[in-house]
C-alpha cells in the first residue's frame, strides 16, 4: 500500500512514488518510526519498470538515456539504467529513512539481453552491493532464492505458502537442510501466507505452533495475503492465544544474545544457526533419520510440534532423539539421559526445546526494543556435563564496522 497502482498503466505491483492518500507526509511517518526504534522496509516489484506517471520519470529517463513517453521495463543488465534507477528513486528514500529493501521478483527468469543472467540472482547482487558500497548502514535485503552462491546477499523469502499442518511439518527439514548449500537464513510467512479457500479464518492452534517454531528459527516474521480472515496480529485472537503469542515474542527477544552470537559464528564459519542433527553428530546413524528436529546453534535442540493436540487431553505427543550425554528441557529444567528417543506430551503452553547439560545460555530480561541502550545480559547455567562455556559476541548492530569492531 505504500505506493499507488495505476489501472491505466495496466495495474500490477510496481510503483516508486508514495501513496499520498495513505501517507500525506511520508517523511514525517518515516521519522516517527525511527523515533520508535522501528526499522522500515519497502516492498518493490522492479519487473514492471518505471512508468510515465512517476514523479521522477523525466529525471530517470534523462539519466538512463531512454526515449520519452513510454514505460521503461526492467533492464538489469544495463548499467546506466540501474544507476539511474538507484540515483533517482532508491537512494533518496534511504536518505529519508528507509533501512532496507524487500524485493519480489516473480516474472521472467532470465535477462532479456544477456540470456544466461538470472534476474533473481542479479537483483540480489545489485541491491545488496549497492547498500554495501553506499552509506554507513549494514546491508540487509529480503528476497527470493536465486540459486547456488546467492546466500551471500539476501535473507530468503520462501514464497506464498499454504496454511495447513502439512506445510508446518515440512519446515524443520526444509530449514535445516538448506544449510547444506550455506543458505542459513530462510524467512517464512509464519503460519502460512494463504488459505486454499479464500475467507478461511486463521486457526489459533496452528498459528500458535507456527510462531512457537519461529521463536527458534533464524528469522521470525509473519505475513499473509490480503484476506480479512487472515489477520495475525496477537490482538486479533482470544485472550489465551494473545498470551501465548506474547510469550513467543518475549521469548524471542530474550534469546537475542544467544542467537546473535550464533549468527556471528555462522558469518565466520558458514555453519548455519539452524542445521540438521548430522552436522553435530555425523557418526551417529540416528542423526540422519531425524528430519523433524534440528540444532539451533551449538547448545539447543528443537523438536517442533507439528500436529494438533488431542481433543480430549489438550496435549500433543512429540518424539525427540537425544544424542549421547545429558540434556535438559529448556522450560522445566528436567534432566534427561541421551542416547535414546524420548516421547512426551506437550500442552499449548509448552514447546520441546532441549539444552546440552553444562551449557551456558545468555539472555535478556523483558525488552520491547533492541535499538535502545544495551540491555543487561542474564546468564542461565544448565547443570551437568563435564564443563561449559559460552563466548558472547556483541557489536553495535547498525553499521558495517562489525567486520573489525566488536566485543567478545
How would you name each of these model-derived features?
Residues 1-351, 355-356, 396-401:
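Catalytic-domain carbohydrate-binding cleft regions of carbohydrate-active enzymes
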Residues 350-408:
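Accessory, solvent-exposed terminal regions and/or long lumenal/extracellular loops of proteins
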Amino acid at each position: 500500500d505504500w505506493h499507488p497502482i495505476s489501472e491505466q498503466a495496466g495495474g500490477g505491483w510496481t510503483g516508486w512514488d508514495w501513496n499520498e492518500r495513505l501517507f500525506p507526509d511520508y517523511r514525517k511517518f518515516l521519522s516517527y518510526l525511527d523515533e520508535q526504534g522501528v526499522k522500515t522496509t519497502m516492498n518493490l516489484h522492479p519487473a514492471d519498470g518505471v512508468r510515465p506517471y512517476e514523479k521522477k520519470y523525466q529525471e530517470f529517463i534523462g539519466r538512463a538515456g531512454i526515449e520519452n513517453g513510454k514505460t521503461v521495463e526492467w533492464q538489469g543488465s544495463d548499467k546506466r539504467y540501474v544507476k539511474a534507477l538507484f540515483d533517482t528513486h532508491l537512494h533518496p528514500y534511504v536518505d529519508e529513512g528507509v533501512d532496507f529493501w524487500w524485493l519480489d521478483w516473480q516474472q521472467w527468469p532470465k535477462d532479456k539481453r544477456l540470456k544466461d543472467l538470472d534476474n533473481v540472482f542479479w537483483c540480489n547482487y545489485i541491491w545488496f552491493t549497492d547498500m554495501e558500497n553506499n552509506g554507513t548502514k549494514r546491508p540487509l535485503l529480503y528476497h527470493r532464492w536465486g540459486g547456488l552462491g546467492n546466500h551471500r546477499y539476501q535473507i530468503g523469502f520462501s514464497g506464498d505458502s499454504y496454511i495447513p499442518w502439512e506445510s508446518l511439518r515440512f519446515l524443520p527439514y526444509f530449514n535445516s537442510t538448506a544449510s547444506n548449500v550455506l543458505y542459513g537464513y530462510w524467512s517464512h510467512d509464519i503460519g502460512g501466507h494463504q488459505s486454499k479457500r479464500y475467507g478461511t479464518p486463521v486457526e489459533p492452534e496452528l498459528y500458535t505452533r507456527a510462531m512457537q517454531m519461529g521463536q527458534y528459527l533464524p528469522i521470525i516474521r509473519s505475513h499473509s495475503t490480503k484476506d480479512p480472515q487472515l489477520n495475525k496480529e496477537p490482538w486479533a485472537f482470544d485472550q489465551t492465544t494473545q498470551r501465548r503469542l506474547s510469550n513467543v515474542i518475549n521469548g524471542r527477544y530474550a534469546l537475542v544474545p544467544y542467537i546473535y552470537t550464533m549468527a556471528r559464528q555462522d558469518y565466520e564459519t558458514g555453519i548455519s544457526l539452524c542445521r540438521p542433527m548430522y552436522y553435530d553428530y555425523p557418526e551417529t546413524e540416528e542423526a540422519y533419520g531425524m528430519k523433524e528436529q534440528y540444532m539451533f546453534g551449538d547448545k539447543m535442540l528443537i523438536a517442533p510440534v507439528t500436529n494438533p493436540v488431542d481433543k480430549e487431553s489438550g496435549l500433543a505427543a512429540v518424539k525427540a532423539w537425544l544424542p549421547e550425554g545429558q540434556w535438559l528441557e529448556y522450560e522445566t529444567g528436567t534432566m534427561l539421559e541421551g542416547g535414546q528417543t524420548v516421547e512426551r506430551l506437550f500442552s499449548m503452553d509448552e514447546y520441546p526445546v532441549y539444552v546440552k547439560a553444562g551449557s551456558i545460555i545468555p539472555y535478556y530480561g523483558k525488552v520491547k526494543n533492541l535499538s535502545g541502550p544495551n540491555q543487561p545480559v542474564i546468564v542461565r547455567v544448565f547443570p551437568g556435563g563435564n564443563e561449559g562455556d559460552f563466548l558472547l559476541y556483541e557489536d553495535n548492530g547498525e553499521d558495517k564496522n562489525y567486520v573489525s569492531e566488536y566485543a567478545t
